Amino acid sequence: MSRWWNSNSQFASDIEKATSETLPAGSEEISLYLEISDQIRSKSVDPKFAMRILKSRIDHSNPNVQIMALKLTDTCVKNGGSGFLLEIASREFMDNLVSILRSPAGIDEDVKMVILRYIQSWALAVPDTNSPLSYIIHVYQNLKDGDYEFPEPSQNITSKFLDTETPPDWTDSEVCLRCRTPFTFTNRKHHCRNCGGVFCNQCSSKTLSLPHLGINQPVRVCDSCYSLRTKPKGSKSRARNERKFHAKTRKTPSKPVTNNEDEDIKRAIELSLKEMPQSREPPSYERPSEANVVISQDQHLTEDEDEELKRAIAISLEEAQKSSQKDDNVTAPNNMNISYPSVPAHTVSTDIRSSPFSGRPSDNPSTLISTADADNITLYATLVQKLKKLPPGSIFTEYQLQELHENMGVMRTRMMRSLGETMSKYNGLIQALQKLQTCMRLNDALIEQRLSSTYAHHYIDSSMDSNRSIEPEPDVISTVRNSSTIPQASSSSVPKIVVDSSPVTENPPSHSDVMGQKDTISSYYSTDTDVSANVMGNRHDEVVFSDTASGEKNTKLNIDESTNYYNTDSIDKVGEPFDEISSGYDDLMNGNDKQGNDIPEVQEASLIEL
């Protein structure tokens, strides 16, 4: 847009230079006049903008400037083309000339005569009153009826004065007008500046200047126009045939051809369209087969081809290859299951297909971008970038860019709506994810609580079992050597005593060995107190003996060592009456048995509570 404004500024400066106040009267620069008219005819400058610049110079207060501006306007009318003629024939320009003629402040006679002469010549050159230029005739008749005297025309004026060959309007087609190749994202459209037809790059790769159209710089032309403009003169009939061919082609651009080659191309296109839904590639880029077409076409690119377009195509192809590789890596089996670790009474197994949050393709077509939309976006961006390098005013000749601009507005609305829907879905998924995380945390806490209670209960049960298993039996140890037996009571409530008659095979541990143990019996037993029968029958006590016969007095023994040292029998092996155990018990406590032998002194021990 800045280039377009700069081009308009340059055009305004050229007009100001051609109608400068410093120029003497009658010293018009015809070459500059023709250059300005060529800019208008080549559509490098908007005709309306050119008309308003000339109108501002005609309204100048200097009569010399007004006359030169009128002469420049007449030159542009005869050489500027039909677009500029329509602007001159508008009410804006013609009414301004009438207002100058009828100015209350008066008007210079030379300026008045120049205005009347040009209005008369333009009106006489208009072929018909029904033409778009008929307002010039209407103004001419009103001035003629208003007692304005027009000068006699210096020559016979016909409509040929206004016939100017201008660049044709561009046509559109889905196939190349020369080779009938369909246009795609990579096979772009190109318009011939001479005939206005649309061709592919191979059929319009040549450039040529067109001075008869006011285009002095080399521009793109098709091969047919290039051969017509460069061949020797003398073949006018062939040139007319070529013009007729282009005219017929523009009228029927999509007319099918009947030869076998075109039919094969059509069948190939239909097959490719049928295979397109089965393709796994995203719709935003072309298939590899079209990439090969790009490579083959890039070999025929000429120096005038836009380098930025080449880079854009190369980048798009690289992105297409990367996207295809990512799709191959991401694709996974649809029947894949996810199983979580098992815990007691809790087993979780989910299926991706049954998950409400599993990734599924959207069925809403408004959220998808078709291949045509992606191509239009890329083409629009490419044309905008290319417009910066084109000559000033080329934006008015880029009709395709204007159409794409309108399409971008509609597409922007659709994409904004799709973006809103996508954001709503995203927010919903975020909320669902937060709820899922909360549920997972609660589930983990419940599992940990249940495991803790289970382990604690198991620990208590095992402790109780161990206490029962290690509780000492109320057995009384004896080392009577004469194998005398003391009768035991059958009741389980009274301690029962069994006397072991086996001889002692080894000496009890010494005092120094017992004191070296970690858990000694000295802290739990008292060797100075006698044990009564009643206390012995009511408490489960562990006892130690001092064997006077062995030579050691009151030796303190460890519990484990004493158990290993003496032979102990369970109380269940004895079933003697209670009266016999009472008498035997009294004798044992007094230190004598029935045979009169000495008995080791029995000392009371405190029960170790486990």
Swiss-Prot record:
Pfam families according to UniProt: FYVE (PF01363), UIM (PF02809), VHS (PF00790), Vps27_GAT-like (PF21356)
Residues involved in Zn(2+) 2 binding: C192, C195, C222, C225
Function of the molecule: Component of the ESCRT-0 complex which is the sorting receptor for ubiquitinated cargo proteins at the multivesicular body (MVB) and recruits ESCRT-I to the MVB outer membrane.
Membrane topology category: Peripheral membrane protein
UniProt similarity note: Belongs to the VPS27 family.
Chain intervals for the UniProt region annotation (Disordered): 229-264, 340-369, 482-517
Location within or outside the cell: Endosome membrane; Cytoplasm
Record protein name field: Vacuolar protein sorting-associated protein 27
One Gene Ontology term of the molecular function aspect: ubiquitin binding
Ranges for domain VHS: 20-151
Zn finger spans (FYVE-type): 170-230
Record gene name: sst4
Any one Gene Ontology BP term: protein transport to vacuole involved in ubiquitin-dependent protein catabolic process via the multivesicular body sorting pathway
Keywords: Cytoplasm, Endosome, Membrane, Metal-binding, Repeat, Zinc, Zinc-finger
Native source organism of the sequence: Schizosaccharomyces pombe (strain 972 / ATCC 24843)
Ligand binding (Zn(2+) 1): C176, C179, C200, C203
Assembly behavior: Component of the ESCRT-0 complex composed of hse1 and sst4.
Domain notes from UniProt: The FYVE domain is involved in the binding to phosphatidylinositol 3-phosphate (PtdIns(3)P) which is required for the association to endosomal membranes. Both IUM domains are necessary for efficient binding to ubiquitin.
Any one cellular-component term (Gene Ontology): cytosol
Compositionally skewed regions (Polar residues) per UniProt: 347-369, 482-494
Domain of life: Eukaryota
InterPro entries named in the record: ENTH_VHS, HGS/VPS27, UIM_dom, VHS_dom, Vps27_GAT-like, Znf_FYVE, Znf_FYVE-rel, Znf_FYVE_PHD
Start and end residues of each UIM domain: 260-279, 304-323
